[in-house]
C-alpha cells in the first residue's frame, strides 16, 4: 500500500501548516483518502503519540491503514463518547475526524467543550468532506476547538457581531436570533491558510452514481393510521392501548416519517413494527446480491433482523469477509467507512438531512469502480419522495417544508389539546 501522489503533496503542505499554525484542515471529498493524508502528516512531524477521534464504525479501516503503512508513532483510536477513558493528554497530535460534527452554533456542544478543555493546546488535524453543510457560521466552532484558533473572539456571540448578519425569526410564539448568515468574505483571509481541499474530480474519480426509486405498496393499516393521525393528531390502539400523539408539527413529521416505513415509537418509548412490506420487498428483490442497507430508526433495524435473520450483520468487518448483508444507521454509517464490497446500496428509508443524503450515497465509491447503483425504497404515496426532492437540492427537509407539503397550518398542531381529547375516544385497531 502506498500514498497517491496528491496525498503525498497534501501531507507535505499540511506538515508545514501544522508546524507553523498548529491547525491544518484537510477538507477533502469522500473517498479521496483523508485518513492516510492525516496519518502521513503525523509521521512527517515526527509525532510519537497520536490521538484519532472518530466514529466506532471507522475504527477498523483506520487501524488497517495505520498497520499497512508501518508508521512509527503510537496511534490511539477512540470515539468522542469514550474520551473520558483516556488518562493523560500527552499526545503530539490530535486528529479530529468529521469535524463538522462539532460545529453547532451558537453554543458549543458538550463534546466540543470536552475536546477543547483537554486537547486545546495540542496541534490538531481536522478532517471533513463537508465542513459547513448548513452555514458558514459553523467555521467558528470548528476552529475554536483549538486554543490556536485564528479567531480571537472569546465566544460565538462576539464573533457574530463582526461576521454574521443576524436575523430575527418567528418560531412558534417566540422570536429568536438566526445566526446562520455568516459573511464568509469578511473572515476567509483569517482561515484560508489553514485549509487544504481536494475533490473526487481532482483525484481522478469517474464513478457514475445511478439512483433508482422503487415504490412499495404498504398495508392498508399504514395508510389508515397516517390519515387518522393527520386528521385527529392522535391514534389510540383498541387492542394494545398504545397511543400515537402528534400534538406538534415536529411530532407529526416524525411519526409520519416512521409510519411510512412500517414502524412507530409510542409515547411510552416502546417501539412497534406495524408493516414489514418494505423488508419483504428487499428480501425478494435482492436475493443473490451482496447489499448494504441504510435505515433510520431502531425499530427498522429490528424489522430487518426479523426478516433476514442470520443473513444480516451490523459489523463492517464481518460484512467484508462473508456473504452477509449489512444494515447501517444513517447517523453512524454515513461517514468514515467504505462499502466497496457491496453490489448495491439500499436505502430502506431516507433522512431529513441533506448532508446525510450526499454522504451516504458515496459509500461505495472507489477509484477503480466506474458505476454505483443506489436503490431508494419508498412507500407508494408516502413521505419519502417529498423528502428526496428536497435533500437532493442540498436542503434539509425541515418542519416548515413538511407542513407546507401537506397543507397543514402551523397553529393547528400547537392548539391540538382539545382535538386530542375528542379524538382519543375514537380508536383505530393497530396490529
Q: What are the functions of these language-model segments?
A:
Residues 1-19:
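N-terminal pre-P-loop "Q-motif" helix
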Residues 1-2, 19-24, 29-33, 37-46, ...:
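Conserved Helicase C-terminal RecA-like lobe
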Residues 30-41, 45-67, 133-138, 297-298:
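Conserved Walker A/P-loop ATP-binding site and its immediately adjacent core
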Residues 35, 83-88, 128-136, 299-303, ...:
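SF2 helicase motor core recognition
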Residues 55, 69-85:
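Inter-Walker segment of RecA-like/P-loop motor cores
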Residues 93, 111-200, 369:
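Conserved P-loop NTPase motor "coupling/switch" region that bridges the ATPase
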Residues 97-99:
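Walker B catalytic acidic pair
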Residues 352-358, 365-431:
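A conserved SF2-helicase RecA2
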Amino acid at each position: 500500500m502506498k500514498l497517491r501522489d496528491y496525498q503525498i503533496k497534501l501531507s507535505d503542505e499540511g506538515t508545514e501548516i501544522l508546524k507553523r499554525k498548529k491547525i491544518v484542515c484537510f477538507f477533502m471529498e469522500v473517498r479521496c483518502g483523508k485518513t492516510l493524508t492525516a496519518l502521513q502528516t503525523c509521521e512527517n512531524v515526527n509525532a510519537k503519540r497520536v490521538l484519532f477521534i472518530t466514529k466506532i464504525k471507522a475504527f477498523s479501516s483506520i487501524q488497517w491503514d495505520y498497520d499497512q503503512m508501518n508508521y512509527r508513532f503510537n496511534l490511539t483510536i477512540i470515539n468522542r463518547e469514550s474520551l473520558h477513558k483516556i488518562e493523560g493528554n500527552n499526545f503530539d497530535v490530535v486528529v479530529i475526524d468529521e469535524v463538522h460534527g462539532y460545529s453547532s452554533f451558537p453554543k458549543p456542544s458538550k463534546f466540543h467543550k470536552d475536546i477543547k478543555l483537554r486537547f486545546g493546546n495540542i496541534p490538531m488535524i481536522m478532517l471533513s468532506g463537508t465542513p459547513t453543510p448548513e452555514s458558514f457560521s459553523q467555521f467558528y466552532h470548528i476552529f475554536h476547538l483549538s486554543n490556536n484558533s485564528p479567531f480571537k473572539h472569546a465566544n460565538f456571540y462576539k464573533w457574530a457581531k463582526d461576521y454574521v448578519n443576524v436575523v430575527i425569526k418567528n418560531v412558534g410564539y417566540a422570536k429568536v436570533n438566526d445566526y446562520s448568515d455568516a459573511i464568509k468574505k469578511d473572515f476567509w483571509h483569517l482561515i484560508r491558510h489553514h485549509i487544504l481541499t481536494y475533490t473526487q474530480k481532482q483525484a481522478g474519480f469517474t464513478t457514475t452514481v445511478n439512483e433508482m426509486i422503487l415504490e412499495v405498496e404498504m398495508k392498508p393499516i399504514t395508510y389508515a393510521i397516517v390519515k387518522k393521525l393527520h386528521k385527529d393528531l392522535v391514534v389510540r390502539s383498541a387492542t394494545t392501548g398504545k397511543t400515537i400523539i402528534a400534538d406538534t408539527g415536529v411530532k407529526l413529521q416524525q411519526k409520519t416519517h416512521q409510519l411510512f416505513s412500517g414502524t412507530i415509537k409510542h409515547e411510552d418509548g416502546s417501539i412497534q413494527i406495524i408493516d414489514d412490506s418494505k423488508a419483504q420487498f428487499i428480501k425478494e428483490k435482492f436475493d443473490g446480491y451482496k447489499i448494504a442497507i441504510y435505515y433510520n430508526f431502531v425499530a427498522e433495524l429490528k424489522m430487518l433482523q426479523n426478516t433476514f435473520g442470520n443473513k444480516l450483520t451490523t459489523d463492517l468487518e464481518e460484512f467484508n469477509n462473508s456473504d452477509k448483508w449489512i444494515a447501517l444507521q444513517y447517523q453512524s454509517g454515513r461517514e468514515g467507512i467504505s462499502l466497496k464490497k457491496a453490489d448495491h446500496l439500499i436505502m430502506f428509508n431516507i433522512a431529513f438531512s441533506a448532508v446525510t443524503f450526499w454522504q451516504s450515497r458515496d459509500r461505495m465509491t472507489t477509484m477503480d469502480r466506474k458505476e454505483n447503483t443506489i436503490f431508494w425504497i419508498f412507500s407508494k404515496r408516502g413521505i419519502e419522495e417529498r423528502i428526496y426532492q428536497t435533500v437532493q437540492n442540498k436542503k434539509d427537509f425541515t418542519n416548515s417544508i413538511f407542513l407546507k407539503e401537506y397543507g397543514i397550518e402551523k397553529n393547528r398542531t400547537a392548539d391540538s389539546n382539545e382535538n386530542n381529547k375528542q379524538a382519543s375516544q375514537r380508536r383505530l385497531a393497530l396490529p
